[in-house]
Every structure is written in C-alpha cells, then in structure tokens.
Regions:
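Flexible "cap/lid" subdomain of the alpha/beta-hydrolase fold that forms the substrate-access gate
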Residues: 2-4, 15-17, 38, 42, ...
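Conserved HGGG/HGGXW glycine-rich cap/lid loop of the alpha/beta-hydrolase fold
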Residues: 20-68
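Glycine-rich phosphate-binding loop signature in dinucleotide/nucleotide-binding domains
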Residues: 24-25, 91-96, 275, 279
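Hydrophobic residues on the short alpha-helix immediately C-terminal to a glycine-rich phosphate/catalytic loop
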Residues: 46, 113, 238, 271-275
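Hydrophobic "lid"/C-terminal helical patch
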Residues: 85, 89, 268, 272, ...
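Short, hydrophobic alpha-helical segments
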Residues: 101, 207, 272-283
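Catalytic histidine-centered segment of alpha/beta-hydrolase-like enzymes
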Residues: 256-269
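Alpha/beta-hydrolase-fold serine-hydrolase catalytic core, especially in secreted/extracellular enzymes
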Residues: 279-303
Length: 303
C-alpha cells in the first residue's frame, strides 16, 4: 500500500487493529473492510480513486496485516468482528454516519453490523461485494452449483492439512494464483502467510454456528450488492430473492471475477461513489432526527 495515508492503532477489546486513513477530514467517511486471505492493502487501487471525495478508512481485520492475531477461535466470531468495526468507526468517524464497503469475508462480517439495530443510523450506506450474509444463506436452500463452488469451506475445516498447504508454498504462490485465475498482478504481501493461517478461523468460528441456527436479520441501512458474474467462489444466485431481508435495494451485475476490486477498480470505485453520494444527504438528515424508539424497525425504503 502506498504511503498516501495516516496509520493509526485502534483498540477493540484486547485486540489492536491497524487502521489506514486518507482524504480530507471534512469529507464523508467511508470504511473499507477486506476479505480472505487479504489485508487492507487490497484496497489500494480503490482508495486512490475515492480519497479525493471521501475520508477513506481501511483496516487490517483481526488476524491479518499489522493487526493483532488472537489465538482462540472464539475471538473470530461475527460478533467480535462487528465490535471491531464499531471500534474503528468510533475512533475515526465520531458520531458522523459512515459509508461501508466489504469484499469477500469483509462483506460477510459487515452484514453482521448492517443487520444489527444497534448500527441503525450509523451506517449511511453499505456496498457488498462477493460476500453474503450467512444468516440469509442458511435460511435459503443452497443450490448445487454454489455447493460445488464452496468446496474450500469444508477444506478449511480440516485439521492440519490447510495450514500445511499455506506453509508449504501456498502463501508464496498466492500472487501467481491470482494472476492465473483472476488475471490481476497483485503485489506480494509480506504477511500473506499470517493472513492465510489466522483467517481460516473466520470460517471455523462462524459457518457451522450459522448453519445450525440462522437468524432473521433485516438490513438497517441502504444496501447495494455488486455481483461479479464470473466469481468462482460466490454464485450470482446467492444475491437474489433478498427483498424480505433488505427491502428495496440495488443489485448490479459486474462483468468480472471474484477479485474485481483489483481487476476493475475504476468500475467498483464509481459504483461505490454513485451509491454513497445518493445516500449521503438522507443519512445526515436521518442521523440528526434519529430517536431511540426507532431502533430495530425494518428498513423498507432504500434508494
């Protein structure tokens, strides 16, 4: 990641998170949450395009990059991850509503906050890329096509073997894998092995728990879903028929693959900006008029 940012350390419980901030302090805040096995560095192309209009905030999620890596599986639950987002937002946005963008596991974990009434009025807009809400997934009937694409989830639950794969060359060859499968030239991340090994706890701490007992989770903020149609890990069908949970929302298919944030940063940045800009003024007005009695109501009207 180019040093066009200020680096902060934010404490979330007993975990220190590395946070990278750029753009004017007066600009609308926009938080970017990365997926697996990335760090906040994956957002560099998007940051460069959005920092002229937004106060761009990205952070290494727990276990990745320069952030602390708890050892217990229980420290990687969706509840803890949503707590990290709150800590980052409190430290960087104050009481101002913020726009939120998540990719891959960053998107999955952001859904926990977006569907939490406690965040109502704080999140001005949410753009989800290649990462569904696990509660929505497991309350629907998973199609065979998606089941076949999700082989890696079962693999990451195996003992020993996944770690060996990453240690014995997987981490070193990761940029090559992205070049072959995604046609992107990713810079080598010096903490790739750390990202990969710790990030497997995200799968182990959350998938079985949500599969056993999916919850009813309704969006508390305007939602936009960007859907890469050639995603080899998440099928486009996983983001359809969500009106019950999201109300009105934006869903747009993008001609791209899973790491579309690296392959097509111009397109993704423009879609983020378009949606966030449309929601900025209503979010500020709603935040000013927000009353505690309204918390928990389902959001039914989204531009």
């Amino acid at each position: 990641m180019a040093r066009a940012y200020e680096m902060l350390t934010v404490q979330s419980g007993d975990v220190n998170l590395a946070v990278y901030v750029s753009g004017s302090r007066r600009a609308p805040p926009l938080i970017l949450v990365h997926g697996y096995p990335d760090s906040a560095a994956v957002w560099a192309p998007i940051r460069a395009r959005l920092a002229k209009r937004y106060r761009v905030i990205a952070y290494d999620v727990r276990g990745a990059g320069a952030s602390d890596a708890p050892r217990r599986r229980a420290d990687y639950t969706l509840e803890r991850l949503a707590g990290d987002l709150k800590a980052v937002a409190d430290a960087t946005c104050g009481g101002r509503p913020f726009h939120l963008v998540g990719h891959d596991w960053g998107s999955i974990q952001c859904w926990e906050a977006v569907t939490d009434p406690a965040f109502r009025g704080r999140i001005a807009s949410y753009t989800s890329i290649s990462g569904p809400c696990l509660d929505h997934v497991f309350r629907a009937k998973m199609r065979l096509k998606q089941s076949l694409k999700s082989w890696y989830i079962a693999f990451f639950h195996l003992p020993v073997v996944p770690s060996l794969v990453w240690r014995l060359g997987g981490a070193a060859l990761w940029p090559r894998w992205l070049q072959i499968t995604e046609r992107v030239r990713a810079e080598r991340d010096p903490v790739q092995l750390k990202n990969a090994l710790n990030g497997m706890q995200l799968y182990r701490a959350n998938f079985l728990a949500r599969a056993r007992k999916p919850r009813e989770r309704y969006a508390q903020a305007p939602v936009q879903i960007l859907v890469p149609v050639r995603d080899r890990y998440v099928t486009p069908e996983m983001s359809v028929d969500l009106d019950r949970w999201l109300g009105d929302h934006v869903r747009e298919e993008i001609d791209g693959s899973h790491w579309v944030v690296l392959r097509h940063p111009d397109i993704i940045a423009s879609r983020i900006d378009r949606f966030a800009s449309a929601q900025e003024r209503p979010a500020v007005a709603n935040a000013a008029a927000q009353r505690p009695a309204s918390a928990g109501r389902r959001l039914n009207s989204v531009s």
